[in-house]
Curated annotation (Swiss-Prot):
<protein>
    <recommendedName>
        <fullName>UPF0434 protein azo1471</fullName>
    </recommendedName>
</protein>
<dbReference type="Pfam" id="PF03966">
    <property type="entry name" value="Trm112p"/>
</dbReference>
<dbReference type="InterPro" id="IPR005651">
    <property type="entry name" value="Trm112-like"/>
</dbReference>
<dbReference type="GO" id="GO:0005829">
    <property type="term" value="C:cytosol"/>
</dbReference>
<comment type="similarity">
    <text>Belongs to the UPF0434 family.</text>
</comment>
Length: 62
């Protein structure tokens, strides 16, 4: 994942910051508790493609 791209990407829903999970190839919005997949190096920033996270999963990221 390109570091410059990570600096400018925000959550498409709340416009908040995203955390990059390299091992899972996901971008996580803690505020909306969503994980957006990265496929073939390309972030898929569509709400319908995002994986919902449990509160415990988000807390583990803090």
């Amino acid at each position: 994942m390109d570091a410059r791209l990570l600096e400018i990407l925000v959550c498409p829903l709340c416009k908040g910051p995203l955390d990059y999970l390299k091992d899972k190839q996901e971008l996580v919005c803690k505020a909306d508790r969503l994980a957006f997949p990265i496929r073939d190096g390309i972030p898929v920033m569509l709400e319908e493609e995002a994986r919902a996270l449990a509160a415990e999963d988000v807390d583990a990221l803090r």
